[in-house]
Amino acid sequence: SRGLGDVYKRQRIGSSTFYIYNILMKSILGISAFYHDSAASIIVNGKIIAAAQEERFTRIKHDLSYPFNAIQFVLKHANLKLSEVDHIVFFEKPFLKFERLLETYVAFAPKGFKSFCKAMPIWLSEKLFQKKLLFNKLKEHDENFNDRKKIMFSDHHLSHAASAYYPSPFNEAIVLTADGVGEWATTTLAIAKENKVDIKKEIHFPHSLGLLYSAFTYYTGFKVNSGEYKLMGLAPYGSPIYKDKILKNLIDVKDDGTFRLNQDYFNYATGLTMTNKKFDSLFVQPARKANNENLTQFHMDIAASIQEVTEEIMIKLATSIKKEYGINNLCLAGGVALNCVANGKLLEKKIFDKIWIQPAAGDAGGSLGAALALWHNELDNPRKVNSNDDMQGSYLGPEFDNTEIEKILKEIGAEYEIKDEKDLISKTAEDLSNGMAVGWFQGRMEFGPRALGARSILGDPRSSSMQKNLNLKVKYRESFRPFAPSVLREDVSEWFNINSDSPYMLLVSSINKKKCFSMTEEQKKLFGIDKLNIKRSEIPAVTHVDYSARIQTVHENTNKRYYELLKKFKEITNCPVLVNTSFNVRGEPIVNTPLDAFNCFMGTDLDKLVIGNFYLDKKKQNQNLKKDYSKEFELD
């Protein structure tokens, strides 16, 4: 794979050629694909124009296929044909990944022969020839596209680091990326200043914090690459009694946070599973079979233990790099940066003055980072810092105007009322205050895994039954899983022990003590899932069993309609907080279109649906349009 720098060294042979090239530069298409969470992003003159994940269009959760639909969308939104795009950049380098596969097999042979044989055919037929594959796929968008030289490849962790730094509100930062694995790197440290990101240090495969966490995700019966957040949500129900066992046997953590994993206990480098029999023996029982076995206190204690190990490593890494480089700002990306509990602990420790986390921290965000790395790092274009950040609230996906929405609603036979802005906000806030569950579909769809008030299901956080009802009757998901609060930015410190912006729901904090209820001695003795039904605060629907909450601060300048809804709800209830969960059911991607939203509305126990200026009441809909929606999607 040709690296970013390789092509531009040739351009720089003649300075005049380089500068003319720079002036003509306008648009870059970034692509991530073929592992999980395929996505496309486009920037024009360095400005982020659009970004979306392929899963939202295909309705396949974590879709890894070539992001045809996402590319079509971002091109249309940028008003560009593919042949008019100046550069196309893939988020990682396939040749280096193949090198890792070969070297890993050689290092562990003959162990791992089975998985090696399984991986080889697809590498030899497709992945090794990624440029050819991409070129053929790209031509499907525009038959006039014929310049293979436009296709380039970034480094996986540079893509992550660039996605974290360039949209951030900082002109200088330490950038920490951590995930499963890119080409070779699993954790990187970069120093970013002005328009440059310089990777200084790396931890290489098979030593990976992301893969360690995924191994425990697998062991507790959840799906790797999608169930890690469930493991994090399960942790507060347990006690970290296995932490010392993990640190003694599985991972050697140094004082500076660097680490090495003991490969005797893992299969991910050589096998078709994450853990092995020796791992099972260490914890005295085999991996949980998700569909056949209940979660027990053991699994909750395991979750608590690996969560605490992860937090300890992240805190040690952050402390050591702050001490070494003395820079006050931290940017985070990579799948591990979606661990909002660990992020909250970093903020709480005040190691850095400010922390900014890329909302699409996983591989989807790599498409954006690859494009930004090319524009700034390689083409040396200047960077203008936005004090709010450049992600535009992460509202970078498709949107539908009222004309388009009404056309779709008429076609499907929906009953609806059209309301003006004021009436729409008032009626929705009133419904929420009366305990109703509302599907909320407004403006551009979010880029990244979190619903942030554009494609959300909303509820009243004061309700003791809201969490249970949303989990079981609307989302069809496990009862232990917590819900997140959206809160007016100006009121956040009144309700939570935090006074920082958290627009992307990537920081966990505790509920303000003034809003908490004390537990009785009897309640304190409860274990595991029995902790769930205790009312702990004035907002029980968003208060986890450890009095924590994953917070989204809502800002008028990024989502005015959602901000106004929260203000109206506060006016009615004296509470500036709403339950906010993604508009989907378990196993389904977040809804993208009005049709997706209506289908989810009719297939669940949602009471109301608000799409644009259209207000829909479940009771007034044709009951023949209902379906058994819980069977539409494979459970994740």
Residue ranges and their predicted role:
Residues R12-Y21:
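Short, positively charged and aromatic/hydrophobic N-terminal segments
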Residues Q72-D86, L138-F145, A318-G326:
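Phosphate/pyrophosphate-binding loops at sites that engage ATP/ADP/AMP, CoA/4′-phosphopantetheine
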Residues L96-R100, K127, K131:
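Phosphate- and other anionic-substrate recognition elements at nucleic-acid/protein interfaces
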Residues L82-K93, I151-M152, G326-G334, G439:
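Short glycine-rich phosphate-binding loop at a beta-alpha junction
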Residues I28-F98:
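N-terminal cofactor/phosphate-binding cores enriched in small/glycine residues
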Residues A304-L330:
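Phosphate/ATP-binding catalytic cores across multiple sugar-kinase/actin-like superfamilies
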Residues S1-Y8:
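Short, small-residue-biased leader/transition segments that mark boundaries at the very start
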Residues I20, F34-Q53, T58-K61, T104-S115, ...:
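Flexible beta->alpha loop and helix N-cap segments adjacent to enzyme active/binding sites
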